[in-house]
Regions:
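Cys-based phosphatases of the PTP/DUSP/CDC25 superfamily and their flanking regulatory architecture
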Residues: 1-173
């Protein structure tokens, strides 16, 4: 989740998990959601949520990550915090899709997805073109990476990562 519930006095996202750990809420006549625990860090919140089908007793555990350091329509001031968030996101991901959302679902989410895709390409030592990544994303969902600042931020984050990798290479060298 790349938004806060309320930003600038406007509701950006309705809360879809219980407020209090160990509290269960029925979503409908079949699904029960329980916030198992939450942990507040500097720029994001980690929530462990349990979704139970009360008819079948099937339980799914969801790790919900809420990045809180990203202003609406802007960008984080530094790439490090977002990279920490992405690193943790990749660490907890076991299988299935990673689901991301912000308020409109294209600005911050699009920027996160673009950066994550390019980081994956870098880890495979593959060629990449950020503008092509964004173009392909926009073929699937119009408006991904919503503002010029977000587009520039994609380049800034990747440049930061490449410089760090180059510095590591020079040290071990």
């Amino acid at each position: 989740m790349m938004t806060q519930e309320v930003e600038g006095g406007k509701v950006k996202c309705q809360r879809y998990w219980p407020d209090t750990p160990r509290t269960a809420e029925m979503v409908d006549d079949r699904l029960q959601i329980t916030l198992i625990k939450d942990q507040y860090l500097d720029n994001f919140v980690i929530r462990l949520i349990e979704v139970k089908d009360v008819q079948t007793n099937e339980i799914q555990r969801v790790t919900h990550l809420n990045y809180t350091g990203w202003p609406d329509h802007g960008t984080p001031s530094q790439p490090e915090q977002l990279l920490t968030f992405i690193s943790y996101m990749r660490h907890v991901h076991r299988s299935g899709p990673i689901i991301t959302h912000c308020s409109a679902g294209i600005g911050r989410s699009g920027t996160l997805i673009c950066i994550d895709v390019v980081l994956g390409l870098i880890s495979k030592d593959a060629d990449f073109d950020i503008s092509d990544v964004v173009r392909n994303m926009r073929l699937q969902r119009q408006g991904m990476v919503q503002t010029e600042d977000q587009y520039i931020f994609c380049y800034q984050v990747i440049l930061y990562v490449l410089r760090c990798l180059q510095a590591e290479e020079n040290i071990s060298g």
